A protein has these predicted regions:
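Terminal low-complexity/charged segments
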Residues: 13-16, 141, 175
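Structural signature of tandem alpha-helical TPR/SEL1-like repeats
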Residues: 23-32, 57-70, 91-104, 114, ...
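TPR-adjacent "capping" and linker segments in tetratricopeptide-repeat scaffold/adaptor proteins
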Residues: 1-13
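Alpha-helical segment of the N-proximal tetratricopeptide repeat
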Residues: 12-40, 53, 57
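Conserved alpha-helical positions within TPR/SEL1-like repeat arrays
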Residues: 19, 46-57, 80-91, 114-125, ...
Length: 219
């Protein structure tokens, strides 16, 4: 959660207090404190974005959307609020709106890796596979060490039957993050699919060692 650069109205102590409550998972207490601050500072977009994030964590997605919309109405170039709108719309199954808002966030911060990553996830959700691949590749162009993007690309290529490309992406994810249990599991399943059964058990064992409760480890 980013904090406002212009702190002329809110004190740093006030900002730190609500951010700490949010970071500690004390969402309702954070909401109560933010509402009290809103009475004195009614047009601070940071507060609306943060209360929206709290609502989202509490499962109150419609309330979250309202707060994020208020934040961008006050501050039309508020990157994080647009990104939060996109993610929340996706969570609600409103994929066209999710894409629209995530693209708006990227227009503000073109090289923000998290926005591109969430856009890629959204495209995959609506089976826009080529656009998902393009967005994931943008993620790794911006941050070549983003292991989850390589793993997700591996999943896309595996699902489309391009198993050897999938293996290359899973192996890259593991190279970046040797403790990436899900990538080991995915790699094992792909080796099994292409009949390299001698390699698959090694990957499954690594996955189990790293994350014993990993679901569907033998996929």
């Amino acid at each position: 959660m980013t904090t406002p650069s212009n702190q002329s109205r809110l004190t740093q102590e006030q900002i730190n207090s609500v951010v700490t409550l949010y970071s500690n998972g004390d969402y309702q207490e954070a909401i109560d404190q933010i509402k009290a601050l809103n009475a004195s500072y009614p047009n601070v977009p940071f507060l609306f974005n943060l209360i929206g994030a709290c609502y989202k964590e509490l499962g109150r997605s419609k309330g979250a959307l309202k707060m994020f919309e208020t934040a961008v109405k006050i501050k039309p170039d508020y990157f994080e609020a647009y990104k939060n709108l996109g993610i929340t719309h996706r969570d609600l199954g409103q994929f066209e709106l999710a894409v629209e808002k995530l693209k708006s966030s990227i227009a503000i911060e073109p090289n923000n890796v998290d926005a591109h990553y969430n856009l890629a996830i959204t495209y995959k959700d609506i089976n826009e596979i080529d656009k998902a691949i393009e967005s994931y590749k943008k993620v790794i162009e911006i941050n070549p060490k983003f292991a989850a993007a390589y793993n997700n690309l591996g999943n896309i290529f595996k699902e489309s039957g391009r198993k050897h490309s999938a293996i290359a992406y899973y192996e890259k994810a593991i190279e970046i993050n040797p403790k990436f249990a899900e990538a080991f599991n995915n790699l094992g399943n792909t080796f099994r699919d292409i009949k390299k059964r001698e390699k698959a058990p090694i990957c499954f064992e690594q996955a189990i060692d790293l994350k014993p409760d990993l679901e569907f480890v033998l996929g």
